């Protein structure tokens, strides 16, 4: 017969003695723990404070991200405390990083509200990053179990349906961000959209910080963009679009802008990561209900994703955003102006595009994970790329990607349409050569393919001449722990 509550509360043991005892002794460390299929797993990179045992640091993170507080509380005995305690079950030293460890923690699935990214993150990252026992802490990876994953809707549209709508297969999609980001009038903004789409791009895009400022209110931007889209589609016979940024101060205003975009004929809208998890999930539900494609700009992510020892690895954001329901997310370029180690970027793209993940330590993927029926998310490569890098972009990123050439389109000396044409010709020439078996990534072959294509395309020749020496060869701050890799454009 089970014990009554009064009987249980009288039990005395080392674990339930009043006062402060180590987290590991409170039950948050269990080296013999057998991981269940239904457990949420989290991998933390932990730098303990001097003198703090790494096992105790891992147990502290497990405790403070689940049920623990700083002292023993008797009300634990009123719960299924053994079940609800997170368990740190493995601690490994990080190669070539003294006093830094990888801690594997397991969480009972019932600790989290179904389909709530806000609740999941409130536990996993809510309190532990300011914990004094650790000098630095980074969430490196997570495994979301099938049972919990199925409560999320996933991307509203997905890669396959998007390609069906565009009737475009076997090649990356092309886009550009309107530049300058801020200051254009609505009429001039719409002209940029028209010129870029008519020149051969599939998409134009608002930048992260264009919302509804005094120089151009959102309705003015939306209307002029749709005019440019419709005129370019009529002129080219292709399906065209522009990511209309509906990010706003309140969800009421976000929905208002989304409904207006739909009413005037847009088939896609855009939001920023800085909106927050609840807002992202909310508009993702709206996008699915209204058959709209949802583009996410990762604005603000590097404030907590870039540093190697503290914050949240972007691969975790990729998982969270795919669960939340976005169709596109900016995920790095390798060769552009933004942070991007080749192996890390490939890992991000795998997380967004694969239906099943296998452990791949060089790519930073630490857990097997089945994405169940959640659709795939299209990565977007944007930031400091140009047509002269086309062979590198296709090699590193593959076909299921949107290549966004902002300055690499609008900065063309002969105008926006010429810049778009240069990118379209470069892409088609490289894809054709690849399909014919050319060793296009070879630094002798790839550039020659572009030079040959430029013989019959003046805009491409001009672009190659202008940007031929432009590259961003900086060492990444975040690199693989289990493989050596170069970040250079090669």
Swiss-Prot record:
The keyword Cell inner membrane does not apply. It is an enzyme of class 4 (lyase). Heterohexadecamer of 8 large chains and 8 small chains. RuBisCO catalyzes two reactions: the carboxylation of D-ribulose 1,5-bisphosphate, the primary event in carbon dioxide fixation, as well as the oxidative fragmentation of the pentose substrate in the photorespiration process. Both reactions occur simultaneously and in competition at the same active site. CDD domains: RuBisCO_large_I. The modification N6-carboxylysine is found at residue 205. It comes from the Eukaryota. Belongs to the RuBisCO large chain family. Type I subfamily. Its main location: plastid. The record marks 337 as: Transition state stabilizer. Its EC number is 4.1.1.39. SUPFAM superfamilies: RuBisCo, C-terminal domain, RuBisCO, large subunit, small (N-terminal) domain. This is Ribulose bisphosphate carboxylase large chain. Binds 1 Mg(2+) ion per subunit. The basic functional RuBisCO is composed of a large chain homodimer in a 'head-to-tail' conformation. In form I RuBisCO this homodimer is arranged in a barrel-like tetramer with the small subunits forming a tetrameric 'cap' on each end of the 'barrel'. It catalyses: 2 (2R)-3-phosphoglycerate + 2 H(+) = D-ribulose 1,5-bisphosphate + CO2 + H2O; D-ribulose 1,5-bisphosphate + O2 = 2-phosphoglycolate + (2R)-3-phosphoglycerate + 2 H(+). GO terms for molecular function: magnesium ion binding; monooxygenase activity; ribulose-bisphosphate carboxylase activity. Its cofactor is Mg(2+). It is found in: Plastid, Chloroplast. Substrate binds at residues 127, 177, 181, 298, 330, 382. One of its GO terms (biological process) is reductive pentose-phosphate cycle. The keyword Transmembrane helix does not apply. Keywords: Calvin cycle, Carbon dioxide fixation, Chloroplast, Lyase, Magnesium, Metal-binding, Monooxygenase, Oxidoreductase, Photorespiration, Photosynthesis, Plastid. GO terms for cellular component: chloroplast. Transmembrane segments: none annotated. It comes from Thalassiosira nordenskioeldii (Marine diatom). Mg(2+) binds at residues 205, 207-208.
């Amino acid at each position: 017969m089970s014990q009554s509550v009064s009987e249980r509360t009288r039990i005395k043991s080392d674990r339930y003695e009043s006062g402060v005892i180590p987290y590991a002794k409170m039950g948050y460390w269990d080296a013999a723990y057998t991981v269940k299929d239904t457990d949420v797993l989290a991998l933390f990179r932990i730098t303990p404070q001097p003198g703090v045992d790494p096992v105790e640091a891992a147990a502290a993170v497990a405790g403070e991200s689940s049920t623990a507080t700083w002292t023993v509380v008797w009300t634990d005995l009123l719960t299924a405390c053994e079940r609800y305690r997170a368990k740190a079950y493995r601690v490994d030293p990080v190669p070539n990083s003294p006093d830094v460890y990888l801690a594997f923690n397991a969480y009972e699935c019932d600790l989290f509200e179904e389909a709530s990214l806000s609740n999941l993150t409130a536990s996993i990252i809510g309190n532990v990053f300011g914990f004094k026992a650790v000098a630095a802490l980074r969430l490196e990876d997570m495994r979301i179990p099938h049972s919990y994953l199925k409560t999320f809707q996933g991307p509203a549209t997905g890669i396959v349906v998007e390609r069906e709508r565009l009737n475009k297969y076997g090649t990356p999609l092309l886009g550009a961000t309107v530049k300058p980001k801020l200051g254009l009038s609505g009429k001039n903004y719409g002209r940029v959209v028209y010129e870029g789409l008519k020149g051969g791009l599939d998409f134009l895009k608002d930048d992260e910080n264009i919302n509804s400022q005094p120089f151009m209110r959102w309705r003015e931007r939306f209307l002029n963009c749709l005019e440019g889209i419709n005129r370019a589609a009529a002129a080219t016979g292709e399906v065209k679009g522009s990511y209309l940024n509906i990010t706003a101060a309140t969800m009421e205003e976000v929905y208002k802008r989304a409904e207006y975009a739909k009413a005037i004929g847009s088939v896609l809208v855009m939001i920023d990561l800085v909106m927050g998890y609840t807002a992202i999930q909310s508009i993702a539900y709206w996008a699915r209900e209204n058959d709209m494609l949802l583009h996410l700009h990762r604005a603000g992510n590097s404030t907590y994703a870039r540093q190697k020892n503290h914050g949240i690895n972007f691969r975790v954001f990729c998982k969270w955003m795919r669960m939340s329901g976005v169709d596109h997310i900016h995920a790095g370029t390798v060769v552009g102006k933004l942070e991007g180690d080749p192996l890390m970027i490939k890992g991000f793209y795998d997380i967004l595009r694969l239906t099943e993940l296998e452990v791949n330590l060089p790519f930073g993927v630490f857990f097997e994970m089945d994405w169940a029926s959640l659709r795939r998310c299209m990565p977007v490569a944007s930031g400091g790329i140009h047509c002269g890098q086309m062979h590198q972009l296709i090699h590193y990123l593959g076909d299921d990607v949107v290549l966004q050439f902002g300055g690499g389109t609008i900065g063309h000396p002969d105008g926006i349409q010429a810049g778009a044409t240069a990118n379209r010709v470069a892409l088609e020439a490289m894809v054709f050569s690849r399909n014919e078996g050319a060793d296009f990534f070879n630094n002798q072959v790839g550039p020659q393919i572009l030079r040959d294509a430029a013989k019959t395309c003046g805009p491409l020749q001009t672009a190659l001449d202008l940007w031929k020496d432009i590259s961003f060869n900086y060492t990444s701050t975040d690199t693989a722990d289990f493989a050596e890799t170069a970040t250079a454009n090669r």
